[in-house]
Each structure stands twice: as structure tokens, then as C-alpha cells.
Amino acid sequence: MGMTVIAFDFGTKSIGCAVGQSITGTAQSLPAFKAQDGIPDWADIEKCLKEWKPDMVVVGLPLNMDGTEQDLTRRARKFGHRLNGRFGVKVAWQDERLTTTQARTEIFERGGYRALKKGKVDSISACLILESWFEEHPEG
């Protein structure tokens, strides 16, 4: 049976969000969450989790190109641990290198420069993170 999974693209000003099904391996973007220095409105996150009832969440890890961690990687991990602590949801991690670049390219190709809104880029990045996770975990 398939799982519902939500992915987050953590950022200090915006946290992208996407939802998908393991059975199809596809994701759709959801509205991004505004954040203040990486802290979202937890009530908004809770509302999203209650609406979609995910079996788990995937948090993108912004690694350096050589695979090492940076400050933002540690903050993304902290965000994931808080999701688990606050809502009891299982959290998995996914390398997100180059997803923002790929998301910008896809959005630009569809709608040009004006379509490149930060929240939209972050949520498309979350889709790419989730689809990558599905590819690496076909069993769900």
C-alpha cells in the first residue's frame, strides 16, 4: 500500500513544501511557508500535516557540493527534529544539492523571469527533493 509523504525544502526565509504518493513516485507543490530566521509558524505546519496526514516527512539537506555539511544543513536537521518532536511524524533526510537551480530552470522555462517567485521556487525544490527520495526508496 502506498504512503503519503510531505517534503520540506528548508530555508531561513521560506520553507518549500510538497506532497506525494509513494505508489506513483510523484509530487505536487504546496504553498511555501514563510519563516523568520528559519522558524516557521508552527501552527501553519501543523495545519498542513493535519490536512494531508502524511505517513512520514522528508527534509532536504543542503549539503556542500563535496557532500560536507554546512550551517544550513545543521539548521535543516534541527527543523526535522522539531517536526518529529512536535508532531510525532517520522522524518527522513534527502540530499538536495542543485534542486533550487533545477527548480529555477523549470519555472523559468514555463513562465519566464516573472514566474521566479521565491516561494514557488522553494516548493518546486521540495517536489524535486521528494521525487528524488521516491527514486532512491521505491519500496516507500
Swiss-Prot record:
SMART domains: YqgFc. It holds the Pfam family RuvX. GO terms for cellular component: cytosol. It is an enzyme of class 3 (hydrolase). Transmembrane segments: none annotated. Its EC number is 3.1.-.-. One of its GO terms (biological process) is rRNA 5'-end processing. Disulfide bonds: none annotated. It is found in: Cytoplasm. GO terms for molecular function: nuclease activity. Keywords: Cytoplasm, Hydrolase, Nuclease, Ribosome biogenesis. CDD domains: YqgF. The keyword Zinc does not apply. It comes from the Bacteria. The keyword Hydrolase applies. PANTHER family: POLYNUCLEOTIDYL TRANSFERASE, RIBONUCLEASE H-LIKE SUPERFAMILY PROTEIN (PTHR33317:SF4). This is Putative pre-16S rRNA nuclease. The lineage of its organism: Bacteria, Pseudomonadati, Pseudomonadota, Gammaproteobacteria, Pasteurellales.
